[in-house]
Amino acid sequence: MPTKSIKIMVEGGNVKPGPPLAPTLSQLGLNVGEVVKKLNEATSSFKGMSVPVTIEVDSNTKKYEIKVGIPTTTALLLKEAGASEPSGDPAHKKIGNLSLEQVIKIVIMKKPGLTTKSLKAAVKSMLGTAKSIGVTVENKDPKELVKEVEEGKYDDLLAKYENEWNEVKE
């Protein structure tokens, strides 16, 4: 069965039946409206964020499968912080604040794409990203939280999520 893969970035829950997607789907003999509807359903939980999507199409049967990826770390942090874009000056202009628990939940969601093996290391990496886009965590500079995480100040909170972290397949 010859398959064709279409890899695209879409806005979660807001895919439109226009170019460049529609012509590609039409060439493969797919119903554009139906595919767009299914894309919007599949990405609705990521409303307003750019989401990587792969559509696997069987050229013979015209059956297709939609595989939704995970939005970028920046997009997830921005959504959680209620901001639309990163700070142009993250050292001086803060765009939002998150709890460490919110950061941990994003880390768990992103685990399949991360190279870090421990929850603690992944959280420290995510704190670095938060700092680079102007998001504070626990009303502090994320760099300060990295030190506190290393010192063990949040070990109890991390332990609470350790099982969930371990259950996620890489």
From Swiss-Prot:
Matching SUPFAM superfamilies: Ribosomal L11/L12e N-terminal domain, Ribosomal protein L11, C-terminal domain
Pfam families to which the protein is assigned, alphabetical: Ribosomal_L11, Ribosomal_L11_N
GO CC list: large ribosomal subunit
SMART domains recorded: RL11 (SM00649)
Regions that span the bilayer: none
Source organism, top-level taxon: Archaea
InterPro entries per record: Ribosomal_uL11 (IPR000911), Ribosomal_uL11_C (IPR020783), Ribosomal_uL11_C_sf (IPR036769), Ribosomal_uL11_CS (IPR020785), Ribosomal_uL11_N (IPR020784), Ribosomal_uL11_N_sf (IPR036796)
Gene Ontology biological process terms, A to Z: translation
GO molecular function, one term: structural constituent of ribosome
CDD domains, per database record: Ribosomal_L11
The entry's keywords: Ribonucleoprotein, Ribosomal protein, RNA-binding, rRNA-binding
PANTHER family noted in UniProt: 60S RIBOSOMAL PROTEIN L12, LARGE RIBOSOMAL SUBUNIT PROTEIN UL11M
Family: Belongs to the universal ribosomal protein uL11 family.
Protein's job: Forms part of the ribosomal stalk which helps the ribosome interact with GTP-bound translation factors.
HAMAP family: Ribosomal_uL11
Complex formation: Part of the ribosomal stalk of the 50S ribosomal subunit. Interacts with L10 and the large rRNA to form the base of the stalk. L10 forms an elongated spine to which L12 dimers bind in a sequential fashion forming a multimeric L10(L12)X complex.
Descriptive protein name: Large ribosomal subunit protein uL11
Gene name tied to this protein: rpl11
